């Protein structure tokens, strides 16, 4: 009898979701209007996001440690910012792929995913009904102990995705680099804010004042207190800082 009970318990555990992982319906979401229907943003966690526009779904940096992807919608488009394990997860990508899913990644991901399109900094393409721009993402200030940047120039991408008339910038792992500060006509921005890999709240505020997104979401912020960023931009009424749970 005890052996049968133990066997039943092992079977239940084998088919149970990994502790801590969440499925659709448990994440925070925002809905923004576009010229052709609403854009729904799902805040998965850390640097991982999902965008839904009509029937089309875009996943950015899907990683299995942030979600149970067997319970999330399949992807029409997957964007990967760089090769680090908290951004690139081939198993999560495989779970989300359909026959016609497009997978786009930065140069540092080449050879790590099958069937991927590599986009260099500065490239643009129309993918799955959206215009996508790959923009630089790198460190200039924060370095490893041997003096090399955590994210070297040219390895990683940020992405600007145009959903009809709404331009959404997902910065990836980067600092407040000149290319970021020169961006124009950004409606929604996701800027990373954790040390030593990306930016301080002061660096994020500096970048936001330069390119002036209408809505700014800090993400990838780890243990950094996002209220500091809210305070820094408190005198910028045209930039709405929205803090969401990112796991």
Which residue ranges define each predicted feature?
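Core dinuclear metal-dependent hydrolase active-site scaffold
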Residues: 24-73, 115-184, 245-247
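Sec/Tat signal peptide C-region and signal peptidase I cleavage site
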Residues: 18-22
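Binuclear metal-ion centers of metallo-dependent hydrolases, dominated by the metallo-beta-lactamase
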Residues: 117-128, 153, 205, 209-247
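Bacterial N-terminal signal peptides
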Residues: 5-17
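A short acidic, amphipathic alpha-helical/loop segment
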Residues: 91-96, 179-182, 203-207, 228-232
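Proline-aspartate-enriched helix->loop->beta-strand connector
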Residues: 186-191, 195-218
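Active-site metal-binding motif and surrounding structural segment of the metallo-beta-lactamase
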Residues: 64-111, 184-190
């Amino acid at each position: 009898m005890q052996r049968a009970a133990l066997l039943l318990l092992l079977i239940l555990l084998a088919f149970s979701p990994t502790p801590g992982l969440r499925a659709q319906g448990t994440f925070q979401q925002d809905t923004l209007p576009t010229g052709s229907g609403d854009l729904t943003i799902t805040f998965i966690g850390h640097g991982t996001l999902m965008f839904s526009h009509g029937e089309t779904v875009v996943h950015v940096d899907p990683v299995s440690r942030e979600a149970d992807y067997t319970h999330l919608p399949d992807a029409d488009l997957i964007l990967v910012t760089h090769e680090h394990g908290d951004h690139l997860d081939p198993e999560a990508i495989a779970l989300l792929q359909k026959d016609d899913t497009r997978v786009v990644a930065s140069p540092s991901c080449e050879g790590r995913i099958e069937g991927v399109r590599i986009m260099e900094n500065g490239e643009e393409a129309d993918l799955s009904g959206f215009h996508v721009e790959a923009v630089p993402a790198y460190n200039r200030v924060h370095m490893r102990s041997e003096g090399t940047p955590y994210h070297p120039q040219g390895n990683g991408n940020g992405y600007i995705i145009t959903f009809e008339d709404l331009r959404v910038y997902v910065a990836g792992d980067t600092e407040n680099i000149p290319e970021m500060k020169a961006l124009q006509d950004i409606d929604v921005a996701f800027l990373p804010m954790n040390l030593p890999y990306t930016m301080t709240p002061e660096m994020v505020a500096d970048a936001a004042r330069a390119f002036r997104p209408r809505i700014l979401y800090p993400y990838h912020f780890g243990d950094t207190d996002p209220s500091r960023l809210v305070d820094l931009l408190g005198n910028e009424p045209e930039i709405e800082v929205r803090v969401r749970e990112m796991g």
